[in-house]
Amino acid sequence: MKNLENLLAEIESKISQQSVLNKSVSEASVGWHVEHILLVINGIISRLKRSNPAEFKGAFKMSRFIVFTTGIIPRGRAKSPESVVPKPFDTESLIAHIAIAKERIKQLDEMNPNFFMEHPFFGHLKKEDTIKFLRIHTNHHLKIINDILK
């Protein structure tokens, strides 16, 4: 699977097609998926930075095991949390969110490996698993975008 920087470059290349919609694939436009990906990346990395490693609670979650083993998030199974549902956006805001994501992704290298974030379905994910989730999630939405554009 591609690293986050390569995935972000692919996302950036889709901005010019943000208004494309194919309801047989998704109720949302290409731009909605791009903005959603960026909200997730930016929000999760921000939460990761603010975490307290002493509060980490590891627990086995079957859903995490399946998604992390297969690298696939099934389509249409989960509803996005309100915090990552795109509000109105335009080309400038997408470009600004790409720039923020690039900076935050660079910050991952210096972060404590014990920093974590809490995922609504997968529980607490330490930095390494958080990065893996971001790659899987981004790839999931890029596949949808590419299907919309077919």
In which residue ranges do the predicted regions lie?
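Amphipathic, non-membrane alpha-helical segments in soluble helical-bundle scaffolds
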Residues: 1-5, 27-34, 87-95, 128-131
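Charge-rich, low-complexity N-terminal segments
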Residues: 3-30
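Substrate/cofactor-recognition hotspot
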Residues: 108
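A short small-residue
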Residues: 18, 77-85, 117-121
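Short, contiguous alpha-helical
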Residues: 20-69, 113-150
